[in-house]
Amino acid sequence: LGDGRAAALTADCSACTGLCCVLLPYRRDQGFGADKPGQVPCLNLLGDDRCGIHADLVEKGWSGCATFECFGAGQHLTAVTYGGRSWREVEDLGEMAAVLSAQRLLHEMLLHLEEGDRRSPDPAAAALAEQLWTLRDAGPLELLTADLDELHETCGELLGAASLRVRGPGRPDHSRADLAGADLREADLHGAGLRGALLIGADLSGVDLGPADLLGADLRGADLRGTVLDDALFLTGPQLAAA
């Protein structure tokens, strides 16, 4: 993954116009300090589209903001999809919100496909990635009419195949298992399949999770002290931030 593509898949709030703070809804029980419907500016958003409490989000009860990641979709939506226009200049914020969700999904798929290609190259995965890189530069209408469900399903299958190649045969499979609150300190999870596993509050301290597949695993409140994650597959910043 070249420097340009790596940067494209990393959020740069300074190049955005606070889109997630306006377009997306949030609730108190999801780690936000208030309830807000979509397409309404956050009460902490300043006139320059910066956050007024960014340095103290967690302390002030806004941990949901600290763990949210758009994977670079926000700045791309601002600069390319809407040609530099901010949400203040767009008439249909509902459409813009839907486009942001589409772009975020594209960017997240690309992030994982690029990792899969880096760890275990596959022509089919590379071809899908190029298709998605092209689609992300499309206009709002094309993005909203694209069959993202089919693309997401194909992406999931290719990532699953890459995961098996990297992890090797015979490793434990706990995909989508409910392991919330479990004491997993003695479990053999090296190279395990933990895709979509519920690991809320689980004790993973000191566990070797390389190269375990953590795609979509819920790590909220998990104890990761001393956990070996260097080689883990498909682990994102928001997952770590939620632990």
What are these regions (language model features)?
Residues 160, 164-243:
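Tandem repeat scaffolds
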Residues 1-120, 127-143, 147, 151-154, ...:
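Hydrophobic scaffolds flanking metal-cofactor catalytic centers in soluble metalloenzymes
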Residues 125-135, 174-183:
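Amphipathic alpha-helical surface "interface" segments used
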